[in-house]
Every structure is written in structure tokens, then in C-alpha cells.
Amino acid sequence: MATKLSEKKKVLVGMSGGIDSSAVCMLLQDQGYEVLGITLRMWDIPSHFSTPGQKEPDHVLEARSLAERLAIPHYTLDVRDEFRKTVVQSFIDEYLRARTPNPCVMCNLYFKWKYLLDEADRLECDYIATGHYARITQNMNRYILEKGLDPKKDQSYFLWRLGQKELSRTLFPLGISQKKK
């Protein structure tokens, strides 16, 4: 089966400023993709800012700095209000109903992928990519979410609600690798 990594050319990478999303950018560049980066600014707390008076959190600055070093465009999307309304409020509501919420599952489907795909469309990207350790295969014209090859890093559980629309446009380059310490 051919891998999705060689089908299209332009990909929008969700960049956290961390090692995994940075590795994704470099891997996709090495594979010949035109890479663009985006950081979703979802939540600010004081520990996100290393310098008093700093206008943007460290992870945004780190993602932008990496994008500059890789010579790729970088965008920041401020979605703090929507994150509070969509993900945080749902988390609170579930606790008030005496349920155990899983905010990552809700965030990925109803929040991250929504914004990443909307921005990918706006920027005319064929795919989005993230640093999640999961894989996507195709069988009988259906996309199937599978566990990442590294059992210690597998993140497919947090992505289980993604549907065909989302999976058909998503790349997980790290899902086929083992994370080194």
C-alpha cells in the first residue's frame, strides 16, 4: 500500500514549539513537501511567559523561531476565547454532571482539527500534519486510524473521534517511528 506521505505537495503543520512538531516539519521538508507552520494559541498561564511583559507565550516564539530557521512561513491563530467556550466549558460541564471528561478527545475533534483544516483551506494546503504518534492507513477507500508503532508513545486514543473527513487530510509522520530519549 502506498503511503500518503508522497501523494500531495503542500502541508500545514500544527507547531507546538516542541521537538515532535519540529521533527514533523523537517521530515516533511526532506520528503519534498512545501511546509507551512501554524501555532494555535489556546491557553495562556503565567508559566508560558519567560519574560515579564512578553506579548506572546514561549511556545509561540519557539515555533516561530524554528519556522524561521527552516525558512517556512509561520502563522499564529489566537483561539483562546473559543478554546474556553468549547473545550474548557465542556470539561467543567461534564464534571458538574458527575462524569469524567476527556478534554483531549473533545479538543482534537471539535477544536484543533476544525481550526487546522479551516486554515489549511484558507492557505490552499492539501494536508495538515501534527506530531502525534499515530498512523493512518487506507483500506477499501476508508481511512483507518491505527496505533503508532512506538507502544510507549502511541496517541491514537486521543484521536479516535476523527472521522473520514479529518483523516483523509491528515499526516502523522512520527507514527511510524520510535521516539528516542
Where are the model-predicted features located?
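A short, charged helix-loop
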Residues: 165-169
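ATP-dependent adenylation/nucleotidyltransferase module used to activate substrates
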Residues: 1-161, 171, 177-181
